[in-house]
């Protein structure tokens, strides 16, 4: 029987932390035994330290005592749901103390020695870790998952990289849950579209180039494609939709692209990792799909859905992509990253 691995969560009382807790319930490999939060929550029982927003708080964690977000009694593997305002120093302190930090926070994503991981797309980027440890003089490590909308975009584009992507134009329709809790004021979003999400467009553009880039022995060579993103907040609860136009150097046919999407599998599928969907990218042939309400929670929220593939009069082809922003776009992504690391022997 496989030895179970104790894990902790940094920022456990916030919305992202709660999604981590929910996703880890019943995990076949990981036991959630430690919860870290702010000083005002430390020392309290978890059930008394936060307001739970996802149904009923799991009994397995309600009685756990919340700790300060400091290395010491935390398990070696910690998931970070820290707010960006405090994540940088806390995550570094844990890595310096020998912890493996799998982070959902944005703070370290674009650092050259930190993997920005989508396990089906760029698992070889984990090879950055030895260089990270040497350069920073620590035995721990920091691994990040991308912005929630970037994950949807790169999962859809990953199978198509073989055709030589040269230009990408992406427009997002992003769910309100992506803004956290309490999120966007109802008077701002009901019956409305907000055509601005702070720093989101820059993150999508830069992160996409890094994720789809190639590992070159000691560094990542970013994808040499021009990427333009426009991000909008819409009155949808869960599920980010991205409309995408792409130009290719190889000039594939529509049939080539469709075959690449439908046949695509990655390392998580080959190794049957617990949180990996059997088909990471699912093509939907219906003219009006994918849709957040109908599709975002399929495959436990861990797949990306693509539809409406057709020629583009400006670039080469265009399509629609969809993914669950708080599952595959956040907690589920980080847990799958840790599963990949375990399958590589990096948690031993």
Model feature map: region roles:
Residues 1-196, 219-220, 226, 304-305, ...:
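N-terminal Rossmann-like NAD(P) cofactor-binding subdomain of oxidoreductases
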Residues 177-348:
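Charged docking surfaces used in two-component/phosphorelay signaling
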């Amino acid at each position: 029987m496989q030895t179970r691995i104790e894990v902790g969560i940094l920022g456990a009382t916030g919305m992202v932390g709660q999604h981590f807790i929910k996703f880890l319930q019943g995990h076949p490999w990981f036991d959630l035994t430690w919860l870290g939060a702010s000083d005002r929550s430390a020392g309290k029982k978890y059930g008394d330290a936060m307001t739970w927003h996802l149904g009923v708080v799991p009994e397995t964690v309600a009685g756990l005592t919340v700790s300060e977000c400091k290395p010491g009694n935390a398990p070696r593997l910690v998931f970070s749901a820290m707010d960006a305002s405090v994540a940088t120093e806390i995550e570094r302190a844990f890595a310096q103390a020998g912890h493996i930090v799998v982070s959902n926070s944005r703070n370290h994503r674009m650092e050259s020695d930190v993997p920005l991981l989508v396990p089906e797309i760029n698992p070889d980027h984990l090879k950055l870790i030895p260089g990270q440890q040497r350069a920073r003089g620590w035995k721990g490590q920091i691994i990040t998952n991308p912005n929630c909308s970037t994950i949807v975009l790169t999962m859809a584009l990953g199978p198509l990289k073989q055709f030589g992507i040269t230009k990408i134009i992406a427009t997002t329709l992003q769910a309100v849950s992506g803004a956290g809790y309490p999120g966007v004021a109802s008077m701002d979003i009901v019956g409305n579209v907000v055509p601005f999400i702070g720093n989101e467009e820059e993150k999508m553009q830069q992160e996409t180039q890094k994720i789809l880039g190639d590992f070159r022995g000691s560094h990542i060579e970013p994808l040499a494609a021009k990427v333009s993103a426009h991000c909008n907040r819409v009155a949808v609860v869960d599920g980010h939709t991205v409309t995408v136009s792409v130009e290719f150097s190889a000039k594939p046919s529509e049939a080539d692209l469709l075959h690449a999407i439908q046949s695509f599998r990655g390392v998580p599928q080959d190794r049957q990792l617990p949180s990996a969907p059997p088909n990471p990218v699912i093509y939907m042939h219906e003219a009006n799909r994918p849709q957040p309400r109908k599709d975002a929670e399929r495959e436990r929220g861990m797949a990306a859905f693509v539809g409406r593939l057709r020629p583009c009069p400006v670039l080469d082809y265009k399509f629609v992509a969809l993914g669950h922003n708080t599952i595959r776009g956040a907690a589920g992504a980080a847990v799958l990253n840790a599963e990949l690391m375990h399958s590589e022997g990096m948690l031993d």
